[in-house]
Amino acid sequence: MGRRYFGTDGIRGTVGEAPITPDFVLRLGYAAGKVLAGTADVAAGARPTVLIGKDTRVSGYMLEAALEAGFSAAGVDVMLAGPMPTPGVAYLTRALRLSAGVVISASHNPYQDNGIKFFSADGNKLPDETEAAIEAWLDKPLECASSDRLGKARRLEDAAGRYIEFCKSTFPAAYDLRGLKLVIDCAHGAAYQIAPHVFHELGADVIPIGVAPNGFNINDGVGATAPDALVRAVRANHADLGIALDGDADRLQVVDSTGRLYNGDELLYVLVKDRIATAGKVDGAVGTLMTNLAVEVALQREGVPFVRAAVGDRYVLEQLRERGWQLGAEGSGHILSLDRHSTGDGIVSALLVLAALKRSDRTLAQMLDGVTLFPQKLINVRMKPGADWKGSASIRAAIDAAEGALAGSGRVLIRASGTEPVLRVMVEAQQAADATRHAEAIADAVRMATS
């Protein structure tokens, strides 16, 4: 039986609508707490402890309180990190030997949305069977622990400082960032008090933008999903590079001094090239079904095996672990380097890119010389929840027409979002006009069939 609440990246939705309501989130905290309590060494008097971090959405206060109450009712202690990037929660959970970590965030979504995602004790996303166990507990009545067994809550002192030091530790000690002018766009999100300090303390001249959250402006015209603001700031300040994070700082986009934008596909290639130069070889790299074909071809040219996972960083992570590889990425900017961190981390990924540039004494454009991305057109089509797009003859006909016209010179990918009622239509072709024309034709068919 499929999961009812957990999607590809936890539980997410519009605040005030099921399941992102305070009563559900309280029960979710209780259910997760009972699952954790079942794995703790209760006989030895152990009490599970979880860490809760959040981004800057106004709803985070409400959901944090609900989660805290649910965990306490289950007899689980809580540590509160306050605003903290998703990868920061993963790191602190592992470093402090806690039972689990919880992030309250909807990542790159607007402030009206929010979500809950969990990390296991080792800083990894929960396995499917644990999520299923939590869902099973949601069906049971909430039976509050006795007063002497209620969980306690306290704030984690200097959570930001601990994570800042971890990020800096991933940058080679032989290098620093002196002489570099960097624009850092924090998307008015979880990294607003962290990312500028990381790069500044490594020596960079930092120009921060997107660092004035008010509860309502997260990802609004700034950050990795709206890089135009970063491009303008880089040009206006004559900066060497711009770094854009999203609301929970697990994804990255980079802009060079000319205003050229580099996505996760290109940055993966840069990191692979750097590893080849420093380690002599790379066993393999993982992308997704959306990864640009040009990057796959370029990696093959370097003798690096390449595997496409389903879209979603959890699936990239699964493929990396299965093969014992270290480097993987999505074009959206989720970059994984498993010898540095257990999950995607925008700040750490940016430091890896900067280290590669320092070691090679080359620019991003120079490192990507000879890699020309195939034009891609991506259209997100909102549809009614539960719409049967797979059974639509008109959508199938539009896809067949596009694939027939491209005839081996491009590809079509249609997939449903795992976090919202959206169908993503992607067409890749040798000519941008062809990609746009075919993507729009398919998107029109989707709108007609699912609206």
UniProtKB/Swiss-Prot annotation:
Record PTM text: Activated by phosphorylation.
Residue positions binding Mg(2+): S107, D246, D248, D250
List of catalytic residues: S107 (phosphoserine intermediate)
GO MF term list: magnesium ion binding; phosphoglucosamine mutase activity; phosphomannomutase activity
Source superkingdom: Bacteria
Phosphoserine: modified positions: S107
Database matches in InterPro entries: A-D-PHexomutase_a/b/a-I, A-D-PHexomutase_a/b/a-I/II/III, A-D-PHexomutase_a/b/a-II, A-D-PHexomutase_a/b/a-III, A-D-PHexomutase_C, A-D-PHexomutase_C_sf, A-D-PHexomutase_CS, Alpha-D-phosphohexomutase_SF
EC number of this enzyme: 5.4.2.10
Statement: the UniProt record of this protein carries the keyword Metal-binding: yes
Cofactor detail note: Binds 1 Mg(2+) ion per subunit.
Catalytic activity, reaction form: alpha-D-glucosamine 1-phosphate = D-glucosamine 6-phosphate
Cofactor(s), by name: Mg(2+)
Entry function: Catalyzes the conversion of glucosamine-6-phosphate to glucosamine-1-phosphate.
Entry's family note: Belongs to the phosphohexose mutase family.
HAMAP family in the cross-refs: GlmM_B
Name assigned to this protein: Phosphoglucosamine mutase
Gene: glmM
